[in-house]
């Protein structure tokens, strides 16, 4: 008898509570969300936090994700009459926080939207209707009455170019949207159990804030002029009150460590222009996973001095083709004047017909002595997953190229005797293959071991800068192909090749699909279909633990290929 399993709808709940005088939090709890953006796997769901401040005038700080729609709006209008709402503060325009802005304005069209210049530009394109707006800059204030004086702090690139933070002098509450957040969903609205929150807090920082460490430190510098913060009202996860100093100090320390790194990549792009935002983020992910510091800057709004300073300190420069406007041409001229020979350079198209041509732009920098680290990323249609994979891998290629000398030095620095002793650890030879929709990846691996018997499980050490890393998050599936001792050379040679960004790893390789969709290598000795259960951070590697769901041996008398080393400083 066939059994049909119907996927149950995700659990979505609301939590309303007072967090400070005349200040109410509306927390939208998404218990079952398991992925946030293409690279961000979630183990503990997430929350979308929105806040009401009721002085003599009333302000709403951020809305929520559109998936909460009617239930959020019903709760909001129970807390405040639409005619009494005066301001809507948009911390930034990412849809998980601004997804219901248009709905709020439909019910309360008189409301003044308060945001940064860039955010107001984005909103105009998002909601397609006129609205009353108030642009704010760093240090601007908005007096709601009853002591609730709101001061705005500019925080670009945390993690969008339009981000602002809002400080209420009356309650000493800092509303931070994405900053200091965590994708962690539970009933406790505060950070009462730091040991439970800490892993997700760090993972969130690494994925979203770490790549912009210098911007984090700049935000801390701007916050120094404010009175002491008593409560951080985050946009995701628990609000930070009980262990606030610990969380803030962690952010500061992590960012200082990142900023001290000698290698920085600057990504210049035209925000909200074609597909610039999405492609810049994909390149940023790939670059950051190599360990370099990444700074993004909007060519259309950044000050020339900031563009020049970032260009001068960067070891690598990546440019998204901007419009052919006077502002953009001035920005490009500033980059060209500040760039110097031996810097790495890369260019990606924005997908807009009248954008600055990519190839002449790249050639200008090449002629000045800069070194292209990846081919121009072409955009001839709406981006696909394959294009985003190409962009991410291009960023990884630049990061690896910039760190090549440091990697060699680290290998040579290992004690000789210890190096030789580690080299006596041997392992089998395997190829990990993975497929997500139309995109795929593969990696030769030898640091593989059985890790459990109940359930059956394996562990694999995967370097953080490997392309396949983004295919091995919790819940992802893959195939572990075992190479045969008598027939491993052709497959090993093929998968040891350095593939250009976005290249098909399986071209001219005989495969057939596993039940989980990943490729099985026809010439492998055996294969196992696996599901990722957890990941352990091991400094420059992830230890990926996965359950084994099924498997098969193609040659019962065959033996596994073994990789014997003599030194331990490389695979």
Curated annotation (Swiss-Prot):
Top-level taxon of origin: Bacteria
Protein name: Putative diflavin flavoprotein A 1
Enzyme class: oxidoreductase
UniProt record similarity statement: In the N-terminal section; belongs to the zinc metallo-hydrolase group 3 family. In the C-terminal section; belongs to the flavodoxin reductase family.
Organism: Thermosynechococcus vestitus (strain NIES-2133 / IAM M-273 / BP-1)
Additional detail: By homology with NorV in E.coli, may be involved in nitric oxide detoxification.
Domain Flavodoxin-like as annotated: residue spans: 265-426
Chain positions covered by the region annotation Zinc metallo-hydrolase: 43-236
Function in brief: Mediates electron transfer from NADH to oxygen, reducing it to water. This modular protein has 3 redox cofactors, in other organisms the same activity requires 2 or 3 proteins.
Positions of transmembrane segments: none
Keywords assigned: Electron transport, Iron, Metal-binding, Oxidoreductase, Transport
């Amino acid at each position: 008898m066939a059994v049909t399993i119907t996927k149950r709808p995700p659990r979505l709940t609301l939590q309303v509570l007072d967090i400070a005088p005349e200040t109410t939090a509306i927390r939208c709890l998404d218990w079952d969300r398991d992925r946030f953006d293409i690279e961000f796997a979630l183990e503990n769901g997430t929350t979308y936090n929105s806040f009401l401040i009721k002085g003599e005038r009333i302000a709403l700080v951020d809305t929520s994700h559109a998936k909460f729609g009617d239930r959020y709006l019903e709760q909001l209008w129970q807390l405040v009459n639409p005619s009494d709402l005066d301001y809507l503060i948009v911390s930034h325009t990412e849809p998980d926080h601004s997804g219901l802005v248009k709905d709020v304005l439909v019910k309360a069209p008189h409301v003044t939207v308060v945001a940064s210049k860039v955010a107001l530009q984005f909103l105009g394109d998002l909601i397609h209707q006129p609205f009353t707006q108030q642009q704010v800059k760093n240090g601007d204030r908005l007096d709601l009455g009853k002591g609730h004086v709101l001061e705005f702090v500019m925080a670009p690139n945390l993690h969008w170019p339009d981000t602002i933070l809002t400080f209420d002098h009356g309650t000493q509450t800092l509303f931070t949207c994405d900053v200091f957040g965590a994708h962690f969903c539970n009933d406790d609205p505060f950070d009462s159990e730091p040991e439970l929150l800490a892993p997700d807090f760090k993972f969130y920082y690494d994925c979203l804030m770490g790549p912009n460490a210098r911007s984090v430190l700049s935000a801390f510098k701007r916050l120094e002029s404010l009175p002491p913060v008593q409560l951080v009202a985050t946009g995701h996860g628990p609000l930070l009150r009980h262990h606030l100093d610990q969380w803030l100090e962690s952010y500061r320390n992590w960012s200082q460590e990142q900023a001290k790194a000698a290698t920085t990549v600057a990504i210049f792009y035209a925000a909200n222009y074609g597909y610039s935002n999405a492609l810049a983020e994909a390149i940023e992910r790939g670059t950051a996973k190599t360990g370099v510091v990444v700074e993004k800057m909007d060519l259309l709004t950044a000050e020339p001095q900031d563009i020049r300073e970032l260009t001068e300190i960067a070891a690598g420069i990546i440019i998204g083709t901007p419009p052919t406007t006077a502002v953009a041409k001035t920005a490009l001229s500033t980059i060209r004047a500040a760039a110097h020979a031996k810097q790495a350079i890369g260019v990606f198209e924005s997908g807009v017909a009248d954008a600055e041509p990519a190839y002449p732009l790249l050639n200008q920098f090449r002629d000045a002595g800069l070194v292209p680290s990846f081919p121009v990323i072409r955009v001839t249609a709406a981006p696909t997953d394959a294009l985003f994979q190409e962009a991410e891998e291009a960023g990884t290629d630049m990061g690896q190229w910039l760190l090549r000398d440091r990697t060699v030095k680290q290998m040579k620095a290992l004690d000789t005797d210890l190096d030789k002793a580690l080299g006596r650890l041997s392992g089998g030879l395997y190829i990990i293959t993975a497929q997500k929709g139309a995109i795929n990846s593969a990696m030769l691996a030898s640091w593989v071991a059985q890790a459990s018997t109940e359930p059956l499980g394996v562990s694999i050490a995967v370097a953080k800068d490997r392309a396949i890393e983004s295919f091995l998050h919790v819940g992802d599936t893959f195939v572990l192909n075992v190479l045969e001792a008598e027939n491993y050379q052709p497959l090993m040679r093929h998968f040891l090749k350095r593939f250009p960004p976005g290249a098909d790893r399986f071209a001219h390789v005989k495969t057939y699909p596993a039940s989980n969709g990943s490729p099985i290598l026809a010439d492998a000795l055996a294969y196992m279909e696996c599901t990722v259960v957890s990941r352990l951070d091991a400094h420059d590697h992830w230890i990926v633990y996965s359950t084994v769901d099924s498997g098969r041996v193609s040659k019962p008398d065959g033996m596994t290929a073994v990789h014997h080393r003599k030194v331990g400083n490389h695979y």
